[in-house]
Swiss-Prot record:
Organism: African swine fever virus (strain E-70 MS44)
PROSITE patterns: BCL2_FAMILY, BH1, BH2
Protein's UniProt name: Apoptosis regulator Bcl-2 homolog
Main location: host cell
Keywords: Apoptosis, Early protein, Host endoplasmic reticulum, Host mitochondrion, Host-virus interaction, Inhibition of host apoptosis by viral BCL2-like protein, Late protein, Modulation of host cell apoptosis by virus
UniProt-annotated location(s): Host mitochondrion; Host endoplasmic reticulum
SUPFAM superfamilies: Bcl-2 inhibitors of programmed cell death
Placement of sequence motif BH1: 76-95
Entries under PANTHER family matching the protein: BCL-2 BCL-2 HOMOLOGY REGION 1-3 DOMAIN-CONTAINING PROTEIN (PTHR11256:SF62), BCL-2 RELATED (PTHR11256)
Motif BH2 in this chain: 126-141
């Protein structure tokens, strides 16, 4: 990797990969950079709010299922708008999915991390850079109020539930040989 690509790789590692590895207990809090320790606070808050709202469960047994479910949910999440709050929801969702895979002992957590990394690189990073990059994300994480966190969590949940409901309906139609 060279120049600009290395900078982008480092941004994604700082914001996304470090938190996911911390969340799934691959690294301790002491191994997080000072920057990662700061953003961990807002991401942990998002995760706690999400826990109070709903239990998210997954049915993931293959690389393709991970890619399909992950891409479906996050594409819906960012369909009409990218903002820092939704990016927080994306990171927490990615961490939750990776933890599910690790806890299920199916050794697919690295697929989640790679899929999340690639989605962020290709779909979110240009927006992030044009909106202040790491510094602005840190500012957002330090100054978010409870209302904006709850609003973003509710929006994320509506997108997640819509996607999962749609997938369930499609599966039901397939099972009944209607499509």
């Amino acid at each position: 990797m060279e120049g600009e690509e290395l900078i982008y790789h480092n941004i994604i590692n700082e914001i996304l990969v470090g938190y996911i590895k911390y969340y799934i207990n691959d690294i301790s809090e002491h191994e997080l950079s000072p920057y990662q320790q700061q953003i961990k606070k807002i991401l942990t808050y998002y995760d706690e709010c999400l826990n109070k709202q709903v239990t998210i469960t997954f049915s993931l047994t293959s690389v393709q299922e991970i890619k399909t479910q992950f891409t479906g949910v996050v594409t819906e999440l960012f369909r009409d708008l990218i903002n820092w709050g939704r990016i927080c929801g994306f990171i927490v969702f990615s961490a939750r999915m990776a933890k599910y895979c690790k806890d299920a002992n199916n050794h697919l957590e690295s697929t989640v991390i790679t899929t999340a990394y690639n989605f962020m690189k290709h779909n979110l990073l240009p927006w992030m850079i044009s909106h202040g990059g790491q510094e602005e994300f840190l500012a957002f994480s330090l100054h978010s109020d409870m209302y904006s966190v709850i609003f973003n969590i509710k929006y994320f949940l509506s997108k997640f539930c819509n996607h999962m409901f749609f997938r369930s309906c499609v599966q039901l139609l397939r099972n009944c040989n209607l499509i």
